[in-house]
Amino acid sequence: MSSTSSPTYTISKTLNTNYPLIDNDPHFRRVIGYARPSDYVHGTVAGAAGPGLLYLMEKMAPSGVGKGGFPKAMRLATAVGFFGGFLYFYQRSILRFYGMSENAREVQMDMREMVDKVKAGQPLYGVSTLPVDVQGMAARQSRYSALFFAVLPWFNFVNHNQHGVDTAKYYQQAERELEAERLGKGSSS
């Protein structure tokens, strides 16, 4: 009996959305890097809402907790607001990767980033030192995880190649661009 094993991949389901899927398990850095200025604004407003409302309520109807009570409540509200604002910011950005909100800008950014990596001969989704089976486990655990953010915030920090998209489009676009560059250089000489 042979004890060799081949890597097993679980084909991920693709959700039916109005916009194209970019990546169903984007790396944390990509989600932050592709965020729009409006995501930062929404996250900041959501984060400031907690301490802002607590301050407003204290001014409108003082709680009378005594010296030192209100600052502790404000520190807690600020910490909760900071994490809540960050999660809202992150979720707005990652939902565009899933194709659940308008993502034309991100589709172009993704195509440019991946085609540049193909041209440079780099792996599309980074290099990982983890074994393939551990990469697969990480992919299965964090795929579409932002849909469950309200219960359990879960991020992808692992480089792997299981992202639910056909990567052939990147290689085909790189070939077209390289051919256009070659023809452009040939006609100019």
Swiss-Prot record:
A Pfam family that the UniProt record links to this protein: NADH-u_ox-rdase
Catalytic activity, EC: 7.1.1.2
Self-association state and partner proteins as the record states: Complex I is composed of about 40 different subunits.
Subcellular location(s) per record: Mitochondrion inner membrane
Post-translational modification: The N-terminus is blocked.
Residue ranges crossing the lipid bilayer per the database entry: 73-88
UniProt catalytic activity: a ubiquinone + NADH + 5 H(+)(in) = a ubiquinol + NAD(+) + 4 H(+)(out)
GO molecular function, one term: NADH dehydrogenase (ubiquinone) activity
PANTHER family tied to this protein: NADH-UBIQUINONE OXIDOREDUCTASE 21KDA SUBUNIT N-TERMINAL DOMAIN-CONTAINING PROTEIN (PTHR34062:SF1), OXIDOREDUCTASE 21 KDA SUBUNIT, PUTATIVE (AFU_ORTHOLOGUE AFUA_4G04750)-RELATED (PTHR34062)
Keyword rRNA-binding: no
Alphabetical keyword list: Membrane, Mitochondrion, Mitochondrion inner membrane, NAD, Oxidoreductase, Translocase, Transmembrane, Transmembrane helix, Ubiquinone
Topology relative to the membrane: Single-pass membrane protein
GO cellular component: mitochondrial inner membrane; respiratory chain complex I
Protein's UniProt name: NADH-ubiquinone oxidoreductase 20.9 kDa subunit
Top-level taxonomic group: Eukaryota
The protein's role, per its UniProt record: Transfer of electrons from NADH to the respiratory chain. The immediate electron acceptor for the enzyme is believed to be ubiquinone.
